[in-house]
Amino acid sequence: MAIFNHLPSSVLQCLAIFLSIIIEALPFILLGAILSGFIEVYLTPDIVQKYLPKNKIGRILFGTFVGFIFPSCECGIVPIVNRFLEKKVPSYTAIPFLATAPIINPIVLFATFSAFGNSWRFVFLRLFGAIIVAISLGILLGFIVDEHIIKESAKPCHFHDYSHKKAYQKIFYALAHAVDELFDTGRYLIFGSFVAASMQIYVPTRILTSIGHNPLTAILIMMLLAFILSLCSEADAFIGTSLLATFGVAPVVAFLLIGPMVDIKNLMMMKNAFKTKFILQFVGTSSLIIIIYCLIVGVMQ
């Protein structure tokens, strides 16, 4: 098109990077949205309650790893966890699920594998980091602090009961939820891709390099970026890989870990469902563990 001939080369480069990120991430967003829709309809708190172990440690581990079997996008995880808590699933089981389900599920792990050039390195770093955070939160809630974390006057989180619907109705609701999920997460992907592309083209390399030289500063910057961008976990690896050359391994791992656990949209939903004291404990504990973990990753490179 003739209009592109009049655009500066920097704009064209930015558009090329922007579109490449979108095209790479879109299939995973679509697959994740469809899966999220079926999880919303078919996975009930009663099913989770049925298979809970009897002891606390077992329940903490169950909450940590069940996300691999019953994955859920972080965009809809808070209402699901709130429903679990209302059904008397212990907080030390539900909150580890909140932390790991958007990260350890097969779609996100495969997206991470694909985004980083078919490398298992970031898959394992992301997986182990999420497990460490989840188990730590479970121990905190199970043995140290008051486990009652739901607001007494919490507003409903729009978790619908589909158990009495007919089979075709369940499929319809699952697909309808998938469409909503796709449009909801798509806007964050577009915004995140634009920011990542713009940073690579318009932010002077010397500034980014100076930030990247200080490991702690780089980790904090990437955590803040993940919080602001509020990307879906199926897509954040594609943003992370575009910033790898600038910031390095440890800050990108921090970006991949904190985003699905603590971002703007999640915080707003948590504020609606959970006590402020718990939210501060969750954010503080998660952030501190991720910082320490990523500093260790940086030293071990």
Curated annotation (Swiss-Prot):
Disruption phenotype: SMU_746c-SMU_747c deletion affects biofilm formation in a medium- and pH-dependent manner. Mutants show a reduced ability to grow in acidified medium, but they survive both short-term or long-term acid stress. Mutants have lower glycolytic activity. Deletion does not affect membrane proton permeability.
Membrane topology: Multi-pass membrane protein
Main subcellular localisation: membrane
Keywords: Amino-acid transport, Cell membrane, Membrane, Transmembrane, Transmembrane helix, Transport
Domain of life: Bacteria
Subcellular location: Cell membrane
InterPro entries hit by this protein: DUF318, UPF0718
Keyword Membrane: yes
One GO term describing the cellular component: plasma membrane
GO BP of this protein: amino acid transport
TM region positions: 15-35, 60-80, 97-117, 124-144, 188-208, 211-231, 238-258, 278-298
PANTHER family linked: UPF0718 PROTEIN YCGR
Sequence similarity: Belongs to the UPF0718 family.
Function: Could be part of a two-component membrane permease system responsible for amino acid transport under low pH. Involved in acidogenesis, biofilm formation and low-pH survival.
Assembly mode: Interacts with SMU_746c.
Protein name: Putative two-component membrane permease complex subunit SMU_747c
Upper taxonomic lineage: Bacteria, Bacillati, Bacillota, Bacilli, Lactobacillales
